[in-house]
Amino acid sequence: MNMSSRIAYTLTTLFVSAPALAAPPTVFIPEGSANSVLMVQAETGKVLRRINDVEAVHGLAGAPGVPYLVAGSYSEIPRENVASLEMPSTVSADDHAAHHAPKAAPMGPPDAGISLLSILDAKSGDILRRIEVPGAVHHTAVSPDGRFAVATHPAGDGISVIDLATFGMTAFVPTGSMPNYAAFGTDPNLVYVSNTGNGTISEVDLSRGIVRRNFIAGDTPEHMAVSPETDRLFVADADAGQVLELSLSTGEKLRTFEIGGEIHGLGLSNDGATLFVAGRGEDKLASVALATREVRTAKLAPEPYHLTVIPGSDILYVSSRAEPVVWLIDTSSMQTRETVSVEGEGHQMVALP
């Protein structure tokens, strides 16, 4: 075997025997009033696909290794119009028929309209199923084991619980006034729900369909981030311009971080050492070093809104509430690397490896 043949053989062997390189993360950006979800390549912002026919999509959630994304609509449909909804092109006839099969007595407030959760394939983005829930959906969350999804209903003062094995709604759990955001820790059976209207966080047992505990959390708790390693829950007290650090074990408030102005999205760095905060009211992005309490800010305008940290990366995605743009931010310098143009406005973004 000559030298060229040996080199070619060696390279071929390496490529065949080496494990396949992991695909770069994908970011799913709900585009709100555009009725669509944009899929982009996380590192570059390159557009991969636009998923259409997801009406008034605001909430979107998934989890690593879970094959589904759950998208919530902020619009409602009169009950009498549900049967006439057009079948999405990617939904099978059997699934569509199951969706319109006779239902048991509706759960939730009796005067609630009907909203739809869309179940998306987490790889392709195809719409697989629609699920009826009682009232407009603000945010959604998916349990780490992929068993449950939840949707918050601000007008209904509770959450819907979905079994992702059967795509059935199993419970409506009253939590408090104007439930806003939902987040899981390490226990896939427990979800934490911020109730903006009464300043509490509800710990909900999803198997039992009950609230186990309520924590006091400022005046207007909205977005949250969980640090499972440290047993901490970070809560945006939006109107107060503060982030509260709570103990998940006791519900006790441990620290308060002053950001200033109205705040919105939260996200933890991949190493859990830094908390990022979207300062919507003062057009800024803030980072909090949790070990030292140091707060750094950088100008970001207009109106930074939702925020998500890209796994295994030094990039942070931040949407604008005022313009159709998402910024790709370097987590160290807090400067913009790239921008992604969106239709409508970017809401609860999901980044999956």
What role is predicted for each listed range?
Residues 8-19:
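Bacterial N-terminal signal peptides
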Residues 1-9:
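Bacterial N-terminal signal peptides that target proteins for export
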Residues 19-353:
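Predominantly soluble domains enriched in secretory-pathway, periplasmic, or organellar proteins
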Residues 2-3, 15, 263:
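Intrinsically disordered, low-complexity segments
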